C-alpha cells in the first residue's frame, strides 16, 4: 500500500474516532458497540469480512469471548507489540482507544452479531490436503474441534470462516515469535508451541489446505 493510501486510511480512522468521541455516547451494549465499530470498518469492512490489502482478517462470525480477548491482548500490548508486526502496530492504538468502561465489551458484542460469510481464499493452489488432514488431526483437532468450529473452554477460535492468507500469516507470526511470546499470553504460547510442530512453510500450506475443506 502506498504512503498516500496509508495517510488517507489513517485520516479516515482519525475522523471516525473524533465522530465517535463527539457523538452522544450510549451506555454499554449493542448501540455503543455499533457506534465504536465506525472506527473498525475502514479496515475490516462494514460487514466485518476483512481486507487482504490491509492485512485485516474476517471478524464477522467470531464469538464475543474471542474478540474480547484479542482486543484485551492488543490493549495491554500482549499482542501487536513486536517491532516487525506491522498489522499489530495498527491494531494496538485502536484497542487502546477503548478506554471507557464497557467499550471493549460493547464492540465485541456488536462484532459477534455480524453474520459470517465465506472466506476469501487466495492460496487455493497451495498445500496437500491429505498431508494437512494428518497434521490437523494430530496438532489442531484437540482445541479447534474436528469441524474447525473452535472451543471456548480451550480458548480456540473457529477457523471455518477465516481467510487462508490470514491463517498463514498468523502461523508465521506464532512460529517467528511475533505473536504468543508475551509471558502473560498463555493461550498464545500454546498456539506458538503448536505452530512450531509444523516443520516448514510446506507443512503450514498443507494444514491450511485441509482447513479450507472444512469451509465448504
Name every feature range the model reports, one short phrase each.
Residues 65-70, 91-134, 139-142, 165-166:
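Intrinsically disordered, glycine/charged-rich N-terminal periplasmic/extracytoplasmic linker segments
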Residues 25-49, 124-149:
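Sequence/structural segment immediately N-terminal to covalent heme-attachment motifs in c-type
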Residues 23-26, 49, 58-60, 106-128, ...:
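His/Cys-centered metal/cofactor-coordination and adjacent catalytic loops
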Residues 52-58, 74-104, 122, 126, ...:
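Axial heme c-ligation environment in periplasmic c-type cytochrome domains
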Residues 1-9:
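Bacterial N-terminal signal peptides that target proteins for export
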Residues 64, 68-76, 104-108, 112, ...:
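An amphipathic alpha-helix signature
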Residues 30, 34-76:
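The feature marks the first
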Residues 19-21:
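C-terminal motif of bacterial Sec signal peptides marking the signal peptidase cleavage site
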Amino acid at each position: 500500500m502506498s504512503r498516500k493510501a496509508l495517510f488517507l486510511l489513517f485520516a479516515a480512522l482519525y475522523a471516525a474516532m473524533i465522530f465517535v468521541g463527539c457523538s452522544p455516547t450510549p451506555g454499554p451494549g449493542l448501540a455503543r458497540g455499533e457506534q465504536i465499530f465506525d472506527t473498525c470498518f475502514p479496515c475490516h469492512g462494514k460487514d466485518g469480512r476483512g481486507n487482504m490489502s490491509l492485512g485485516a482478517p474476517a471478524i464477522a462470525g467470531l464469538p464475543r469471548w474471542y474478540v474480547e480477548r484479542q482486543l484485551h491482548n492488543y490493549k495491554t500490548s500482549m499482542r501487536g507489540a513486536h517491532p516487525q508486526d506491522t498489522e499489530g502496530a495498527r491494531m494496538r492504538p485502536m484497542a487502546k482507544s477503548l478506554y471507557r468502561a464497557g467499550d471493549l465489551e460493547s464492540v465485541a458484542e456488536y462484532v459477534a452479531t455480524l453474520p459470517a460469510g465465506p472466506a476469501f481464499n487466495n492460496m487455493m493452489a497451495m498445500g496437500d490436503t491429505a498431508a494437512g488432514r494428518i497434521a490437523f488431526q494430530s496438532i489442531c483437532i484437540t482445541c479447534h474441534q474436528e469441524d474447525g468450529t473452535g472451543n471456548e473452554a480451550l480458548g480456540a477460535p473457529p477457523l471455518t470462516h477465516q481467510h487462508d492468507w490470514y491463517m498463514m500469516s498468523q502461523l508465521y507470526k506464532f512460529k517467528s515469535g511475533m505473536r504468543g511470546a508475551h509471558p502473560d499470553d498463555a493461550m498464545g504460547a500454546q498456539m506458538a508451541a503448536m505452530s512450531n510442530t509444523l516443520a516448514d512453510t510446506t507443512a503450514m500450506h498443507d494444514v491450511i489446505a485441509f482447513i479450507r475443506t472444512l469451509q465448504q
